[in-house]
Regions:
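A short acidic/basic microdomain associated with nuclease active sites
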Residues: 39-56
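Interdomain/boundary linker segments immediately adjacent to catalytic/signaling cores
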Residues: 1-20
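Conserved catalytic cores of phosphodiester-cleaving nucleases, focusing on short active-site segments
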Residues: 22, 66-84, 95
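Nucleic-acid nuclease catalytic cores
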Residues: 79-130
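Intrinsic disorder/low-complexity segments
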Residues: 1-2, 124-141
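N-terminal, polar/charged subdomain of small-to-medium soluble alpha/beta proteins
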Residues: 32, 63, 69-70, 125
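Hot-dog-fold acyl-thioester-processing enzymes
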Residues: 23-30
Length: 141
């Protein structure tokens, strides 16, 4: 499945969740519902994936956790906030940089129309070798 197809499936899954339960719930509720929708669509995903930081050749664990990695190519961060702030987008970009994944989605469920709560970002930090679309992303663990 191509990256755009994966992101479309994730967005459609999120829209299904949002249309069923609406805005106003806690982030954890949306996480559980989205996991169900992704599994119904037979998408491979991991939840709460730890992201290490390599510092002077040493892998350190600062406690960063990504909400979802879907089909090993799309990073997904879930929010249920009144407004998406620059710090939320910076978090997404940092996670993309650390993971080496090509695309990230930030989905804020606390909006009337979900399309207004979706932000898609491309990882501009990938090395030339990693930017080859035929090369799988580096493993996270």
């Amino acid at each position: 499945m191509k990256i755009n197809e994966v992101t479309d499936c994730i967005i459609n899954s999120a829209m299904e969740v949002h249309s069923a339960v609406g805005p106003g719930l806690l982030e954890k509720a949306y996480n559980v519902c989205l996991a169900y929708e992704l599994s119904v669509r037979n998408l491979h995903f991991e939840r709460q994936v730890r992201l290490p930081v390599t510092y002077h050749g040493i892998r350190l664990d600062p406690g960063f956790r990504v909400d979802y990695i879907v089909e090993n190519c799309v990073l997904v961060e879930i929010k249920a906030v009144e407004k998406v702030h620059p710090v939320h987008l910076a978090q997404l970009l940092s996670y993309l940089k650390l993971s080496g994944l090509p695309v990230g989605l930030l989905i804020n469920f606390n909006v009337v129309h979900l399309r207004e709560g979706i932000r898609r970002r491309v990882n501009n930090y990938r090395s030339e070798d990693e930017s080859d679309p035929r090369r799988p992303p580096r493993p996270l663990r």
